[in-house]
Amino acid sequence: MSGGDSPAPRVLLGVSGGIAAYKAAEVVRLLVDRGASVRVLMTPAAQRFITPLTLSVLSKSPVVADLWDPASGAVDHIELARWGEVLAVAPATADVLAKMARGIGDEALSTYALAHRRAIVVAPAMNTWMWAHPATQENVRILRGR
């Protein structure tokens, strides 16, 4: 990822609450191994599948898991928006896709997504019926149009 004297890419990884959340550990490890600086944001549901501690150890940074708990490593979402060069949401549940498409910021990940002004990469992860639902497809169309 980083070559020569160029600074390490700054990646914000948003982890939402589906069974695929456990794969976030491998994503963080791969990014760090390739020279990226990684910060992780988690939804409350994601924390039911993988702990913030796991992702904090792998990313070597505090995980933002709760906007309102200073002990969770929360920082100003505007500060994070300035820091992150790319927001990668993996996995992106139907819930998080809907929040991002409709401008709902009710937890750390969705609030940050509203403040982020750079590249966003989304890796949807849900069952096929949820993916095929017209509401989900409309949310994907909205996000692609931005």
Residue spans of the language-model regions?
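A cross-family phosphate/adenosyl-ligand binding-site feature
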Residues: 1-146
